[in-house]
Each structure stands twice: as C-alpha cells, then as structure tokens.
Amino acid sequence: MKRTMWTKFITYCFGLICLAGCSSSSDPEIRTVCLRDAIGNYIIKWETIPSLAGTVRIFESDVPNQFDETEPVLQAPIDRGVSTFITNDNITRKYFKLVFNNRYSQVIGARTMAMDSVQNLRDLGGYLNKNRQSIRWGRIFRSGQLSTLSEWDADRLDRLNLKCILDLRTESEQQRDPIRYTHAPVHHLPVSTGKLQEAHERIARDQIRIGDALLYMQDYYLQLITPENSQSLAEALAMMRDSTNFPMLVQCSLGKDRTGFLIAMLLYILEVPEETILKDYVRSNESIRFELLAPLVQHFSMDAQEAVTALLSANEDFLLLALETIRKEYGSIATYQHLVLHIDEKARREIQANLLEH
C-alpha cells in the first residue's frame, strides 16, 4: 500500500497517534493504530516517516504503564507495517508497546472497546496535543449508559479499575434506567436534554420529519452551553482536577451528545487540536451499535426512521454550532471555560498533569 493511502487509512480510523517526546528533530515520526477484528484479535499497524529499516518488537500488557520486555509477543520487519496479536481473551483489555530498533517506543491500545450491553465505550488515550504530549491510556473513558449490563461487561469494566463514574443524565433518566454497575462510585451531574422528550413523543405519534429532528438537535446543543447546564459541566471538570478520581468514566444515554460536549471541553483543556476533537466526536457513529436499536424503530414510517437516525447520529455540525456560539459570545473557548466552567490556569495545569504523559 502506498504511503499516502496508508496515512489516509490510519487517519480515517481516528486512531492516529504520533511518537511524542522525541529528543531531536532527526527522530522519525511514527504513526500507529490498533484495531480489533471481528473475532477479537488485535490488528496493530504502523508507519514511520521517513521509512526505517530494521525490526519492531511488540510487548503486551493488561495495563498501559507496565510491560515485561523480556520476550516480545510479536516481532516483524518495520517495513511490513502490520502485525496481528491473536487472542481468545475478549474480557481483558490489552495494551501494546512497540519498540523500533531498540530505540524508539510507543504504547497503544484499541480505542473502542467491544461490549455486549454498553454502547460507545472508548479510551481517550493516545491523542496528541499541540505540544506533542500524549493523553495517557487507561485514564479517561467515555460511554453510553450502564443500565443494561451483562455479566461479561461488568467483568470488562472491573478490569478498567474505575475510581469514578460521572453520569450526565437527568434525574428522570437515572430513575428510569439506573446504573447497574456497583464497583465504582457514581456522581450524578444532570445535564438537560432540552426539548428532546418532545421529539420522542412526536416520533411515537409519527409526527416528525428529519428537518424537525435536526432543529431539535441544534436546540439541544445550544442548551448545553446555557447556565442551566453549566454547573454540572463545571463540577465534572472540577472532579478531573483530583488525581484520585482516575481512571474515570464519563457516561450519558449513548455517550455522544452530553458526553461528547464535555469530552470536547476536556480535550480543549488538554490543548488537543480542534481537528482531532471533531474526529473523536464523530467517532460515536462507528462505535454505537445501531443494529441493537433497530427493533425500536422498525415499525415507524420511513420519515420517522430518518428522524430517529438524525437524533442518534453524532453530527459534526451540532458541535460546531455550540463552539461557534461560544466564540461569538465569549471570544474564545478558553474564555468560556474560565468564566463559565471555572477553569483557571491552575485548574488547567492540574487536569493536564492528571491526563498527559510527562
């Protein structure tokens, strides 16, 4: 595969991670991505710029910060660009350390986690900020609600060693679909869904079209930045200042809107480029298993089904609308975070210290 095609593929997967902490400008840029195939094996891919000759050794661990480097689990010529770690363990999350020519190394994991009953569970590790610092793997996760939790998924969550769960759903949502996971403290920080309940009622009556759904979603995202919701968002970010709250999971109904906006604010604090922030946001469209939701809408009219699709999708335009409104009203994202979300320079440094590689 030509380099341009290879680069586009890795970028498309949104798993783009470049070697951070290079000691000099002569060090190569290393791009990696880790994916799971249909049966759970790990597909590890890499590219070096410029191309390197030699060998890449790959070590495996259940945790991202400790590897036994006595014997690699995989070894390949660097120019091969891909290797597969075969496993029948679909419970324990695996991380991999790639060592190129015994000189350059990088840790990577599969960003999206395969779950039976939980939607959209992802690790934010590996994203690079503008200073080429990487977000630490296994520290901050995002997902949909934990209200229908299988035994296998409860075991998978146990392996994450969560210290804190932030639930952004409203009180009525929490009462209707309580969190079933009991091995980590849950902090309820309700964020309003605006007029979405009205949209759901119109869907049930088959009185909604896709244009209506788009307007509801635009209103929803503008509601996220109102004073009504600012307190919960500020409290969520305040909890990220405390290192004892990590590893942390942020969740809402599907993990795409309220969670998506909060995670976007976090990534700005970590100084991640906006292009990466938007790519992470729309990745929900790949991580949500829409086939599990299909039985709920199969009897609706085609118009209603199109409206539901719009409501369930992570549309970049919705997040951009909120960001543009913030910039228009406050001048910048940083000013909004300071004045409304109470993120001063001290808070920013504390959050960065908790989540960025040093």
Describe each PLM feature range.
Residues T11-A20:
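Bacterial N-terminal signal peptides
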Residues C22-L249, L262-H358:
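Cys-dependent protein tyrosine phosphatase-like superfamily
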Residues L254, R258-T259:
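Ser/Thr-glycine-rich phosphate-binding loops at phosphate-binding pockets of nucleotides
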